Amino acid sequence: MQLFIEYFPLLIFFIINSIAGIYWATGSLIVAAFVQIFYYKIKKEKIPAKQWIIFGLIVVFGGLTIYLQNDAFLKWKVTIINAFFAAALLVSNTFFNKNIIKEFLAESLSLPENIWSRLNLAWALFFLFCSGLNYYIAFNYDLDTWVNFKVFGLTGLMFLFSITSILFLYKYLEVEEEINDTDTINNEKTKEST
């Protein structure tokens, strides 16, 4: 359900764009973003900071797109969101010694510090790549190509990069499991001997 809620505005945007065009799709995207925030409020869930940022940019850039009847604002939104995430990861780690990726995943993963740093840098570079790629496609191809890229291309890239990250982390997870298994066996032997 959480995955559906996260991608709900994007799905609505794609469907309405194919039926009624970019400006109706943009209006629907804004409404869907409001519905998404409302859903979190009803469920009394904490709304992630990432969601507030995306919501704010959708409202501002979507509003400008509709008001000025210029789809360039909507195209810039995707570029800016990805650049913002890249900058947030890099700046927080470099200047504030705070690894955002570690903050999100530390409860479920125990990794060496250098691996957290590499993972943080990898995601920052990925978001920077997505930002540049979106800019290139948005302003060098027709609107329908960009919409398809935004909905399917970026989502697919995110999925593939997530899988790649998991595969990268897998060897560290196996080591942690072996350590936990060894600790469990040692604890059981200690109990048996007492």
Swiss-Prot record:
Supply the gene name.
yciB
Where this protein primarily resides, as one coarse class?
membrane
Q: What does this protein do?
A: Plays a role in cell envelope biogenesis, maintenance of cell envelope integrity and membrane homeostasis.
Q: Which HAMAP family match?
A: YciB
Covalent S-S links between cysteines:
none
Asked if the Swiss-Prot or TrEMBL record annotates the protein with the keyword Membrane, the reply is: yes
The question of whether Metal-binding is a record keyword is answered with no
Family named by the database record: Belongs to the YciB family.
- The name on file for this protein is Inner membrane-spanning protein YciB
State the compartments where it is located: Cell inner membrane
How this chain sits in the membrane, per its record, is:
Multi-pass membrane protein
Gene Ontology, cellular component aspect = plasma membrane
